[in-house]
Amino acid sequence: MKVAIYSRVMDENQRQDIELFFDELKNQKLQPLIFHTYFEQIKNTIALPSNAEVFHSPEHLNSEIQAIISLGGDGTLLDTVTLVRSHNLPVMGINFGRLGFLASIGRAEVKTAIKSLVNHSFDTAPASFPQ
């Protein structure tokens, strides 16, 4: 299963959480497709799965992608939704900082959330965008 990963910036305070996140992706046999600017920030400091790939634009998100995971707060989640609005992809928001209103999955729930994604045991809510 292939999932896209989007984030704006790697905060050094979140390094351990990010490592655990990518470890869980590997444990669940998920292949990450990481947004290029985030990949450049983490590639030398985080042990990424060997099958990790990079994407540069929404056009690189093909039918193999099962979901996109946003790592950050509500602003990052809104950026993620804007990025993939022309795709019919579920978006999961994981917040490693203060708990947000939109990105409501906290660090303690990462493993459970990823397992739910793998098992397709999650609910989606429709979103609409102004034209």
Regions found by a protein language model. Give the residues of each.
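Extreme N-terminal starter segment of soluble prokaryotic enzymes
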Residues: 1-3
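A short, Lys/Arg-enriched amphipathic alpha-helix followed by its capping loop at the start of a domain
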Residues: 20-30
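Short acidic low-complexity segments
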Residues: 52-65
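N-terminal beta-loop-helix "entrance" segment that forms/cooperates
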Residues: 37-54
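Short glycine/serine/threonine-rich phosphate/pyrophosphate-binding segments
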Residues: 14-15, 75-81
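Catalytic core of DAGKc-family lipid kinases
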Residues: 101-131
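Short internal beta-strands
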Residues: 30-38
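Short glycine-rich anion-binding loops that position phosphate/pyrophosphate groups of nucleotides
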Residues: 10, 74-76, 99
